[in-house]
A protein has these predicted regions:
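Acidic, Gly/Ser/Thr-rich repeat motifs that build Ca2+-stabilized beta-propeller blades
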Residues: 4, 22-195, 250-253, 257-270, ...
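Conserved blade-ending motifs and adjacent loop-strand segments that build the rim/top face
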Residues: 245, 363-384
Length: 404
């Protein structure tokens, strides 16, 4: 049966609408943003927590925030996406509206403005990308350009990159990230409904239920990289990088190694973290991996058919353990994290406690509770320094700071 994500709030909080029009708004108002302050969730970890390595510093409160990102090399700016279709810029203790596309964004079900990503050459080309769910339910990637100063979006700069029709209210995916190879990666859900009724995840002719890898063109649209694993295969979409995914809502690249880690939201019993090791830090992982859905849910057999050479997850969290919708995170890389440096931090929408583990192709070591809790944890984010943030749909954006 269909997992009751709506009860956990994500279904009614993560819907974004997109239209094919190319105009954009850049907003004008600005106001003072709160300075970072200790959050109650960070200063008072849950009793019995296995580690007390971080505290949570509140960056600010927002209207249903969904993600945090920063341009490469820019330590002065952080950007927060809000579900309704706005991007808020944080700079020098103040906030301003960087983009407002709320008229395009569907906000029911698991929709909304879900993430953003900055082009590796953003400092010179000012190109950035957003992932949202359009008013007709389509999964949409749009490109915009910032002004030369980088504090607003250029009016009329919007260009459609990719649009994928989606038939149902759930499993909308939502993540955008540029990999170490300079290509744009996006995670698309399987099309929704219980058990992948359309069998999209194992179908190489469909983009739903996939991780895709594309090279966005400056004027809109995209190229398919020649190195993608299914380029030239009859009946397969060349954009596909990995398949067999249910709802890859959050994924990230390790900024030190290039390894790719995917949080794939489960169905009835199992939430999973998938790990794709990098060939090199500069190239990222090799493509073509089958992650098993809907033949497998985690390591457990789920549906009919076969999943050739599928790769099992490195972490499983069951619903019996209090999980309901896993939220993939980031590998902690700044030296300031001390003993936690090199650990992967992740969480879950229902079980709000943060967790850490050391990941490799062989599995996970030391998977444990970190201590602080974040209610309605919908995302993690990373700034230009590699510092990691937790995002609560209740409004809080919190930086994970070393304790002591």
């Amino acid at each position: 049966m269909k997992r009751a994500v709506a009860v956990a709030t994500i279904c009614c909080s993560l819907t974004f609408a997109v239209s094919a029009c190319a105009s954009s708004g850049d907003g004008s108002g600005s106001q003072t943003a709160g300075r970072e302050a200790a959050s109650p969730g960070g200063s008072a970890p849950q009793a019995g927590a296995a580690a007390k390595g971080v505290r949570l510093l509140r960056v600010g409160s927002f209207d249903e925030p969904t993600y945090l990102a920063a341009p490469p090399g820019d330590r002065a700016r952080r950007f927060v996406t809000e579900r309704e279709g706005r991007i808020v810029l944080l700079r020098k203790g103040r906030r301003s509206t960087f983009l407002d596309i709320s008229s395009r964004v569907e906000t029911g079900g698991e929709s909304g403005l879900l993430s953003m990503a900055f082009h590796p050459g953003y400092r010179s080309n000012r190109r950035y990308f957003v992932y949202y769910v359009a008013n007709d339910g389509a999964l949409t990637i749009f490109q915009f350009r910032a002004t030369a100063a980088g504090n607003a979006t250029r009016k009329g700069s919007g260009r459609l990159v990719l649009r994928v029709p989606h038939p149902r209210f759930n499993h909308k995916g939502g993540q955008l990230q540029f990999g170490p190879d300079g290509m744009l990666y996006a995670g698309f859900g399987d099309g929704g409904g219980g058990g992948d009724p359309d069998r999209n995840a194992q179908d190489l002719g469909e983009l739903l239920g996939k991780l895709v890898r594309i090279d966005p063109k400056p004027g809109g649209g995209y190229r398919i990289p020649r190195g993608n694993p299914f380029v030239g295969r009859s009946g397969a979409r060349g954009e596909i990088f990995a398949y067999g995914l249910r709802n890859p809502y959050r994924f990230s690249f390790d900024r030190a190694t290039g390894d790719l880690t995917i949080g794939d939201v489960g169905q009835d019993e199992v939430e999973e973290i998938d790990f794709l090791p990098a060939v090199s830090a500069a190239s990222g992982p090799r493509g073509g991996t089958n992650l098993g859905w809907s033949v497998f849910e985690g390591n457990r057999r789920f549906g009919a058919g076969s999943a050739p050479a599928h790769v099992a997850p490195v972490i499983e969290r069951t619903h019996d353990q209090g999980s309901c919708s896993i939220t993939g995170g980031y590998v902690l890389r700044p030296r300031s994290y001390g003993a936690l440096r090199g650990s992967y931090v992740y969480g879950d929408l229902c079980d709000s406690g943060l967790r850490v583990a050391r990941l490799s192709s062989g599995g996970a070591r030391g998977d444990r509770a970190l201590g602080p809790s974040v209610p309605q944890l919908v995302s993690f984010g990373e700034d230009a320094r590699g510092r990691v943030y937790a995002v609560s749909l209740e409004g809080g954006v919190l930086r994970l700071a070393p304790r002591g």
